[in-house]
Structures are given as C-alpha cells and as structure tokens.
C-alpha cells in the first residue's frame, strides 16, 4: 500500500485537497480527527494535561475546553511542544494501526492528512509527501475571511508554525493552491499519474 503524507499551513487549503482525494475514492486518515478520538479513548491524556497545565482548560463539569486550550498552545511554542509530547505517541500509534488495517484489506493507497506531518517526523514513515502551498498574502486573506481574525492575529498564527517555504524541503510534490480551483485539480491529477495513485481505483 502506498502511504502518502499531505500537509500544509493554516489557510493553505489542505482540507480541500483532502476532500478531493476522498471524492476520488482514496482513503484519508485525518490526524486532527485522530487527535479527537484518542482524547476520548485515553482519559490518561487529559489527566496529564490537567497535571501539566492546571484546571483552567476544564469547565465546571470537568469537560476539556479544547478550543480555548488550542488558542493557548497555539501562541506558545514551549507549551505546544509539551502538549505534543503528551498526545503525539497516542496519535502516531493510532495512525500506524489504521494504516496497517487498510493494508491488510488490500487497499492500494492511503493519504495521511496531518498539519504537523513534518514537525513530528511522521513524514519519514510515508512513501511520498505532498505540500499544499499558497503565497502568504493569500494565506492571510483566507484565514481572515474564514476565522474573522485581524491581519496581525493571522500573521502571529502563521509565524508560530513551520513556514511553507521550510516545509518545501521535506516533500516530494508541491500543490500550488493560490490560483483557480481548476488549476489545483490539474496539479492533483498530475501527481496522481506520477505515483500511479489511480491504479486499481
């Protein structure tokens, strides 16, 4: 089974590319969804979070306020790293288990959609890696429109991530998602042909 890593930055349109793969009947593992599932399945993760970061991110019913916590760690690289050290082993284990299952079912291709594919070295376990790239102006505009943030807030978020230019060094293919949707589709088709993704599909 061909394992493909798909990554990008905030506002790059990675979710759109992921959806296109799904529409092409290609299996996609969404690392963000996996992270939500492991939180449900492994209560010890939230115990570790509470021990490390305190009670501020739990409501009066003891429920984890995921969005508030996300905003908190997004603005602090040391805190984000501490959280990733807690949760990432569970995420990686679940991803490996899911991909092994798909392989045992004789699936030809599986795409892993992961925003921190490179930062957490998951790209090394993939056969091919793809970056969804956009220019910075487009990135800022899209996030402002989607999330209602100020330009300064968006720039701060972008700067808290590994830059798309840096990510380019680690991937095999780049999809320029700055332009027309039709152009993005053509690029995906070319990549799919190059790695024979359509074989058996």
UniProtKB/Swiss-Prot annotation:
UniProt-listed Pfam families: CoaE (PF01121)
The reaction(s) this protein catalyses: 3'-dephospho-CoA + ATP = ADP + CoA + H(+)
Enzyme Commission number(s): 2.7.1.24
Compartmental location: Cytoplasm
GO molecular function: ATP binding; dephospho-CoA kinase activity
Database matches in Gene3D superfamilies: P-loop containing nucleotide triphosphate hydrolases
Enzymatic class: transferase
DPCK domain residues: 3-201
GO cellular component term, pick one: cytoplasm
Associated pathway: Cofactor biosynthesis; coenzyme A biosynthesis; CoA from (R)-pantothenate: step 5/5
TM regions (residue ranges): none
InterPro entries attached to this UniProt entry: Depp_CoAkinase, P-loop_NTPase
Sequence positions that bind ATP: 11-16
Protein family per UniProt: Belongs to the CoaE family.
PANTHER family on file: BIFUNCTIONAL COENZYME A SYNTHASE-RELATED, DEPHOSPHO-COA KINASE-RELATED
Functional note: Catalyzes the phosphorylation of the 3'-hydroxyl group of dephosphocoenzyme A to form coenzyme A.
This protein's name: Dephospho-CoA kinase
Lineage per the UniProt record: Bacteria, Bacillati, Bacillota, Clostridia, Eubacteriales
């Amino acid at each position: 089974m061909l394992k493909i890593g798909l990554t990008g930055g905030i506002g790059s349109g990675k979710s759109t590319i992921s959806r296109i793969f799904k529409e092409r009947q290609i299996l996609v593992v969404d690392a963000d969804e996996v992270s939500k599932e492991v939180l449900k399945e492994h209560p010890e993760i939230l115990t570790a979070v509470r021990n490390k970061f305190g009670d501020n991110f739990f409501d009066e019913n003891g429920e984890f306020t995921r969005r508030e916590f996300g905003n908190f760690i997004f603005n602090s690289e040391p805190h984000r790293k501490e959280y990733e050290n807690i949760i990432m082993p569970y995420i990686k284990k679940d991803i490996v288990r899911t991909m092994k299952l798909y392989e045992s079912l004789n699936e030809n291709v599986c795409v892993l959609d992961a925003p921190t594919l490179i930062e957490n070295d998951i790209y090394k376990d993939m056969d091919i890696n793809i970056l969804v790239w956009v220019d910075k102006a487009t990135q800022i505009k899209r996030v402002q429109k989607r999330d209602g943030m100020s330009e300064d807030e968006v720039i701060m978020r972008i700067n808290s991530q590994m830059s798309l230019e840096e990510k380019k060094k680690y991937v095999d293919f780049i999809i320029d998602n700055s332009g027309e949707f039709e152009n993005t589709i053509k690029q995906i088709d070319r990549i799919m042909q190059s790695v024979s993704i359509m074989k058996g599909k």
